[in-house]
Each structure stands twice: as C-alpha cells, then as structure tokens.
C-alpha cells in the first residue's frame, strides 16, 4: 500500500507516491511533535515579519496568527490529529492551518524552508529546557547549602581510594557537590549563549530572495543575534552537542554523588538514612530498603553519555548543508534533556531530606588512623623535615595496626618511641575536632570555613 502523493507538500516533482513503509520510516512526527509550541512561536514571528516587509497583508498576518493560536489550543487540549503521512510537526501544523483558514495558510512558508524552521525550533526548545534545568540545579544547590549549614560540625571520614584518609565535616562534603554543580550551571549558561543565535532566514541553505527582516524576527523570538552564514545556520548542531556534553558532565557528577549515597546507606557504612519515599523494597527479601533513586540516576548517566556520542557520530560525516541524517538529532537531545532535568529534580527533592547518622560517621572517622597526617604536621612544626615525619608516623601506624590502637589511643610513652619530639600537647592534635579545626582556610573543612562558604553560596544563588 502506498501513500497518496497529494498529501505531500513536495509531491509535484514525483511520479508515484512514497511507499507506505518508507513514509513511516522517514516520518518524525511521533517524536518532534513536542516542538509544536516553538514551531508555532517561530511561525508567528515569521508571519509578523512577512507582513512588515509587505509579503503578507496585515489581514493575512492576523488570520495566520489567529489560526496558529487556535491550533496550539487544539494541541494542548488533546484535540489535534497528528498524521504520520504529513511527516513532521511542521507540515502537520501547516496542513491544519490551511484546513482552517484556506489559501492564506499556504503563504506562511514564503521565504522559509523546513531546514531553517527546524533549526530555529530546536534552539527555541533547548533554550527553554536549559532554563528549566538551571532552576533545578539551583534548587538542588539550595538543599546542599541547607545540609552544609546544619552539619557544619558533623565529622565524618574523608576518603581516598575509598580508604579512610583524613577527617572532614559532612557540611564540607556537601559543599564539594555544590561546587561541582556551580560549574555545571556555568557550562549550561555558556551553552545557552552560543545556541541563542537565530538561523531563521537561512531558508534551505543559501538564504532567500524575499526582502526579509531577520533583525525583526530575531528580536521577536528573543535571540541574541542573527546567524551570520546561511549554510552554517541550517546545518549547525554544535549547540546540541555542547548541551549534551554539559549534560554528560552534570550527570557524571550526579552519578558520583549517587555512588556515595548508595554506599552511605548500606549496612557497611550506615552514614545516612534516606526517607522511605525515596526507596523501594524487595519482592522476596522483607528486610530490604533499596536506594533506588540514586541507583537509577547512576544508571541513567549512561543514557546521556550515549546521547553525546550519538550526536557526535551523527554529525561527523555530513557535508554542508542540511542532510536527512539530522532528523536523528532530536531523540537523543530530547532524552538527554529529560533525563538530566528529572535526575536533578529527584536529587533536589531528596537531598534536604537526608538524615546523617552522626555517631556512625564519627565512629568511622575514629578508625583508620585518620589523624596520621596531623601527627606528621605536628612533627614538622617541631622542626623535622616532612619526609622524615612521614616515615616516623608510618612506623607509628604500623605499630597501631599490630596492637589494635589508633594514634589517639596510644600513650605518650608509646608515641615517643617513634620520636622524642612528641610531647603531651600532641593529643590535642590527634582529636577529630583538632584535625578539622586546624584546616581553617578558604576551602578548608573547618566548621568556621564551612559556614563562610555557605554564606558565599547563598550570595551566589541570590545573584542568579
């Protein structure tokens, strides 16, 4: 069975209709219909400009705009009949417009191609998506600042190689994630600046012979600047790749955070409690409380990484200008944006509800010789070279492993067998509080610095 060629806007050149399977295979309306609002926005701006330069009359413009607004209302009410035989969101809307207002609807596409139309739609859509994502990043950062402020003095072990390294505060750890998200925010803001260039007016690839006013359309659509080259305008997908790159980095950060949350909720760590509403159980093991939200976010990072690689692979072999390959840009881009936004939303809801288990964190920090570096620094202040101090403390740790004693549990006599520079005041250095308070500089883990960083973070968010 074949489609009726008269359904196609380009059917005049063809002597037979498109095969029915090919029509389904090449159609994109099943996924690009989500661009409807931005497609209509672009069409209204285009019609307004055409009237301004005299290609349309004011009456024709008004008829077109009224028709497009009615179509948008139909779509949002679920009353629009999306047709696969019309290929995509653009032709579905144009066909419906012509059905509603007659021949005037056929004038809308004057001076425009689907090539520059879709390039405009995607940029408008992604611009809005980035704004939504930025708001979720800010909301998550607010939750992290709240935890950091409440837990500025809560001591936990810091890790390297997933082994106890030095004591830090839980608040300091939350601020590390705040910093990562700040970079994610900046990358997306930067990406938004570069995508905010208007391709509309590039037409198919070479521009148009009509006396269009691209500056007017640019202003109406809120773009920063008009694109400077028509070939590049219709073929560029750098902005989508750049977004997926920034989204991949953000998802990588969330995946790392997820890994820590999964570890911290486990029976082996028991550092935090997650509320039941963010967890699920097991169909067979009654005791289970599984951290599904962080596990899923960790898993979903792969989808966004895949979107980035998919777009890079899609674009790498394309000559100028537009090619049908570019139809494949939307699904990975849509999925990357959806996944990042939903993951951020889940985290923004979850992070303020985390309950640190103070006693378990402290107990873990007391194990593993977490103040060994503090003892080495103590000896440095006594005039010994750091490398010698490192070796001295290494011997003390070895002794502790053999005797089952932490450094703070050893007597002064035991400690002095490794260096006669060690005096009674060493025990103030070997406490967890002494260790974190000693790191009292910008970026350090001391509670005073955590509180100062929270204030800086609040000021940053307030300025957005």
UniProtKB/Swiss-Prot annotation:
Its main location: cytoplasm. It catalyses: 2-(N(omega)-L-arginino)succinate = fumarate + L-arginine. It comes from the Bacteria. One of its GO terms (cellular component) is cytosol. Pathway: Amino-acid biosynthesis; L-arginine biosynthesis; L-arginine from L-ornithine and carbamoyl phosphate: step 3/3. Keywords: Amino-acid biosynthesis, Arginine biosynthesis, Cytoplasm, Lyase. It is found in: Cytoplasm. Gene3D superfamilies: Fumarase/aspartase (C-terminal domain) (1.10.40.30), Fumarase/aspartase (Central domain) (1.20.200.10), Fumarase/aspartase (N-terminal domain) (1.10.275.10). Its EC number is 4.3.2.1. One of its GO terms (biological process) is L-arginine biosynthetic process. It holds the Pfam family ASL_C2. It is an enzyme of class 4 (lyase). GO terms for molecular function: argininosuccinate lyase activity. Belongs to the lyase 1 family. Argininosuccinate lyase subfamily. This is Argininosuccinate lyase.
């Amino acid at each position: 069975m074949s489609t009726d060629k008269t359904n196609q806007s380009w059917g005049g050149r063809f002597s037979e209709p498109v095969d029915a399977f090919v029509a389904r295979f090449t159609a994109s309306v099943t996924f690009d219909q989500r661009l409807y609002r931005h497609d209509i926005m672009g069409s209204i701006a285009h019609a307004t400009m055409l009237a301004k330069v005299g290609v349309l009359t004011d009456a024709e413009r008004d008829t077109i705009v009224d028709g497009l607004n009615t179509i948008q209302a139909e779509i949002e009410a679920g009353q629009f009949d999306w047709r696969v035989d019309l290929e995509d969101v653009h032709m579905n809307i144009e066909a419906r417009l012509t059905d509603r207002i007659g021949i005037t609807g056929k004038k809308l596409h004057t001076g425009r191609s689907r090539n520059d139309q879709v390039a405009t739609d995607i940029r408008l859509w992604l611009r809005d998506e980035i704004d939504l994502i930025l708001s979720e990043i800010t909301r998550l950062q607010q939750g992290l600042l709240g935890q950091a402020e409440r837990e500025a003095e809560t001591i936990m072990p810091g890790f390297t190689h997933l082994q106890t390294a030095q004591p830090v505060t839980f608040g300091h750890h939350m601020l590390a994630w705040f910093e990562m998200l700040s970079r994610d925010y900046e990358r997306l803001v930067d990406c938004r600046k570069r995508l905010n260039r208007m391709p509309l007016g590039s037409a198919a690839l070479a521009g148009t012979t009509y006396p269009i006013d691209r500056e007017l359309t640019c202003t109406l659509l809120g773009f920063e600047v008009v694109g400077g080259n028509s070939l590049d305008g219709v073929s560029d997908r750098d902005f989508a790749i750049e977004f997926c790159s920034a989204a991949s980095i953000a998802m990588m950060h969330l995946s790392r955070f997820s890994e820590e949350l999964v570890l911290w909720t486990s029976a082996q760590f028991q550092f935090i409690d997650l509320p039941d509403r963010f967890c699920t159980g097991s169909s067979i093991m009654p005791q289970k409380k599984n951290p599904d939200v962080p596990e899923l976010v960790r898993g979903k990072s792969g989808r966004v990484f895949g979107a980035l690689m998919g777009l890079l692979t899609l674009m790498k072999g394309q000559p100028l200008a537009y090619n049908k390959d570019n139809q494949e840009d939307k699904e990975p881009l849509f999925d990357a944006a959806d996944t990042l936004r939903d993951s951020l939303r889940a985290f923004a809801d979850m992070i303020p509800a985390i309950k640190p288990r103070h006693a378990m964190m402290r107990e873990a920090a007391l194990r593993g010789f977490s103040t060994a570096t503090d003892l080495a620094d103590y000896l440095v202040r006594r005039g010994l070279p750091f490398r010698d101090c490192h070796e001295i403390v290494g011997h003390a740790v070895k002794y502790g492993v053999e005797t089952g004693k932490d450094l703070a549990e050893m007597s002064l006599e035991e400690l002095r067998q490794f260096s006669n520079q060690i005096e009674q005041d060493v025990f103030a250095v070997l406490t967890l509080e002494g260790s974190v308070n000693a790191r009292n500089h910008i970026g350090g883990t001391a509670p005073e610095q955590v509180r100062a960083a929270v204030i800086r973070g609040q000021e940053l968010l307030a300025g957005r």
